[in-house]
Amino acid sequence: MRNLIFEEPEGIPGNSSSSLRYAWQSIRAPVIIPLLKLAVIVCSVMSIMLFVERVAMAAVILIVKVLRKKRYTKYNLEAMKQKLERSKKYPMVLIQIPMYNEKEVYKLSIGAVCGLSWPADRFIVQVLDDSTNPVLRELVEMECQKWIQKGVNVKYENRRNRNGYKAGALKEGLEKQYVEDCEFVAIFDADFQPDADFLWNTIPYLLENPKLGLVQARWKFVNSEECMMTRLQEMSLDYHFSVEQEVGSSTYSFFGFNGTAGVWRIQAIKDAGGWKDRTTVEDMDLAVRASLHGWEFVFVGDVKVKNELPSTFKAYRFQQHRWSCGPANLFKKMTKEIICCKRVPLLKRLHLIYAFFFVRKIVAHWVTFFFYCIVIPACVIVPEVNLKKQIAIYIPATITILNAVSTPRSMHLLVLWILFENVMSLHRTKAAIIGLLEANRVNEWVVTEKLGNAMKQRNNARPSRASRFRIIERIHPLEIIVGMYMLHCATYDLLFGHDHFFVYLLLQAGAFFTMGFGLVGTIVPT
């Protein structure tokens, strides 16, 4: 056998393209093909794991719909309300609004919360303002004073530091002396606007069942029509609430706190050890620990709280990094604690580790990116690797349909949603790896930018000559590189292939280029 390392084989052309071709051929059989076959096997296993999980959740939802019995419907809400009104024993409720430089939306949440129809002497509004802008801090405090003059018990709290970020603010808020008499705490992010009857539709569950530690409401998106990116986000989040959260609640297994639009029993927070800032998903961290202490949760899908989706691609990327990195990091930190916990049944612990964390927070991201964006395109240019259509086409198609049925009004956007989610899987995969390895960006906390009415005001105003779009800030090299790779594979399949994968590859390459050049979402002039 010719020594490819120390001897120069005869007949090797001298130009660079021929050298690259020779190098490719020399490693193709001994290295590329075995590695690609292994990757296909691993990705196929992950696809089947995700498929089984999605089908199982779909079966639960089907049973729930057929029987018309969701977890919260076993309670008679109207009867519980009447019982509370007759007794006049209204519990003291703390309402926390954490915010950080939320100049576009701070009035929305403060105004909505102060307008809640609960006895005025039985709730405290706590505005936790970590803003670093002194002018904005003054504006927020003035807004609080306005509602104080109207008779609402509002407490404005501003820290000199941002230790612990949101978790730190919530923790310090609960330590205030005036909170000692509060039994429950409702939490709303700065862009959330609860309806006036929110407390009437959530607190009775906690009063009726002393084992309940959390009542989680659903999100309702006020700006889903703003651009195509917000419509596609709506599809993903609708699946999360209508399927993942509902299944966790209906099966008494586990579902995570969404960080906002929920009401906690303060004793449950104390039993769990309080808020911790060890990850960027302090809400999920608290929910897992409370669940391990035996507290139950209920998801009330009929209660919807208006809020805003991130409409700029930059803001959405930062949000998805936090939402993907944090769970992976928490999974690493809590696996041993979950396994060793004897207070909850073994089946619930297995569900928490395998289904909730491993499949939904790790496998779902990895299989989407590695299989659909790396391995399948590679199989096109290495036809020696057998890729079964059941794995490459039928299983992904079934998973996609199960995801999309939760938002029927957007079914016509299904293809765009697939392409969009595949591109975002690049960032989610990278973030999950960072979380597992605890790399340098593992605790990166960037508040998701919300535009509120800002874009309406900008659209109505005459654009300034000084306003410019910074092209360089809109270019994302990783997306462009993956797009070029998929375009190369698509071209090869178009010229030499026979499986017609080039149709998918061209569309997906176009999606990577579109997002790589920042041509998605709302573009805000600088």
UniProtKB/Swiss-Prot annotation:
Keyword Glycoprotein: no
InterPro entries membership: Glyco_trans_2-like, Nucleotide-diphossugar_trans
Membrane topology qualifier: Multi-pass membrane protein
GO cellular component, one term: Golgi membrane
Location(s), subcellular: Golgi apparatus membrane
Use in biotechnology or industry: Guar gum also called guaran is a galactomannan extracted from guar seed endosperm. Gums are most commonly used as food additives to provide stiffness and texture, prevent ice crystal formation, maintain crispiness, and retain moisture. They have many other non-food applications such as dying and printing aids in the textile industry, thickeners for shampoos and conditioners, binders and hardeners for paper, rheological facilitators for concrete, and drilling agents for oil and gas wells.
Binding site residues for substrate: D189, D191
Domain of life where this protein originates: Eukaryota
GO molecular function, one term: glucomannan 4-beta-mannosyltransferase activity
Catalytic reactions on record: GDP-mannose + (glucomannan)n = GDP + (glucomannan)n+1
Active-site residues per Swiss-Prot or TrEMBL entry: D130, D283
BP terms from Gene Ontology: cell wall organization
Coiled-coil boundaries: none
Main location (coarse class): Golgi
E.C. numbers: 2.4.1.32
Role of this protein: Possesses 4-beta-mannosyltransferase activity on mannan using GDP-mannose. The beta-1,4-mannan product is the backbone for galactomannan synthesis by galactomannan galactosyltransferase. The galactomannan is a hemicellulosic storage polysaccharide accumulated in the form of secondary wall thickenings in the seed endosperm.
Miscellaneous information on this protein: Galactomannan is accumulated only in the endosperm and constitutes more than 90% of this tissue at maturity. Galactomannan is made by the combined actions of two enzymes: mannan synthase (ManS), which makes beta-1,4-linked mannan backbone, and alpha-galactosyltransferase, which adds galactosyl residues to the mannan backbone. The mannose/galactose ratio of guar galactomannan is 2. The degree of galactosyl substitution on the mannan backbone determines the quality of galactomannan as a gum. A mannose/galactose ratio of 4 provides a gum of higher quality than a ratio of 2.
PANTHER family the UniProt entry points to: GLUCOMANNAN 4-BETA-MANNOSYLTRANSFERASE 9, OS09G0572500 PROTEIN
Membership in a protein family: Belongs to the glycosyltransferase 2 family. Plant cellulose synthase-like A subfamily.
Name used for this protein in its record: Glucomannan 4-beta-mannosyltransferase 1
Taxonomic source organism: Cyamopsis tetragonoloba
Gene: ManS
